[in-house]
């Protein structure tokens, strides 16, 4: 009887593991889905140029995430540079050993008083034909058109219901 109970328990455990495996991993959060979609689209574009795909490097994506988290915390897409200096220093310390080719999605402008303002520029387009056309236009940016650059740090953030993204490309 004990052997039958043990066998039944083993079979049930195996069936449970099989069911969990069949279900797959937990679904990705929308920002993570967008990030994976963007990276796939970038690499599809680079394949048409016969360039190597961009490999995401966790340390570099963590550095990009530092930027977007500051915008998320403020709930804004524009922040005075005086409030982002510490973030920039942290980003620089995380990326300092890498050769940066270019950055996309993060810009700077001057306000009326002459103060520099950091801005999140790139909205994540919808995964529709129109959105893909919009992204295709964005992929003409210098950052994605350098064959020697093969590493990327990328981050996505949602602010007021709109997703934005930024990335830096490295050799």
What are these regions (language model features)?
Residues 10-13, 53:
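Enrichment for repetitive, rod-forming helical segments
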Residues 26, 30-97, 152:
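Short, well-ordered surface patches within globular domains
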Residues 85-171:
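A well-ordered secondary-structure block
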Residues 1-11:
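Bacterial N-terminal signal peptides that target proteins for export
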Residues 1, 24-25:
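Intrinsically disordered, low-complexity Ser/Thr/Pro-rich tracts
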Residues 13, 47, 69, 73-76, ...:
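Generic surface-pattern signal
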Residues 19-22:
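C-terminal motif of bacterial Sec signal peptides marking the signal peptidase cleavage site
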């Amino acid at each position: 009887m004990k052997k039958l109970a043990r066998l039944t328990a083993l079979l049930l455990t195996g069936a449970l593991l099989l069911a969990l495996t069949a279900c797959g991993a937990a679904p990705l959060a929308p920002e993570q889905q967008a990030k994976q979609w963007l990276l796939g689209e970038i690499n599809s574009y680079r394949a048409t140029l016969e360039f190597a795909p961009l490999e995401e490097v966790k340390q570099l994506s963590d550095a990009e995430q530092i930027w977007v988290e500051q915008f998320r915390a403020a709930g804004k897409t524009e922040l005075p540079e005086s409030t982002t200096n510490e973030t920039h220093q942290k980003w620089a310390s995380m990326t300092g050993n890498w050769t940066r080719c270019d950055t996309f999605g993060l810009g700077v402008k001057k306000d009326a008083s002459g103060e520099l303002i950091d801005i999140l520029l790139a909205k994540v387009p919808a995964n529709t034909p129109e959105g893909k056309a919009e992204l295709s236009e964005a992929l003409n940016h210098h950052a994605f058109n350098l064959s020697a650059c093969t590493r990327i740090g990328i981050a996505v953030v949602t602010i007021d219901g709109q997703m934005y993204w930024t990335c830096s490309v490295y050799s």
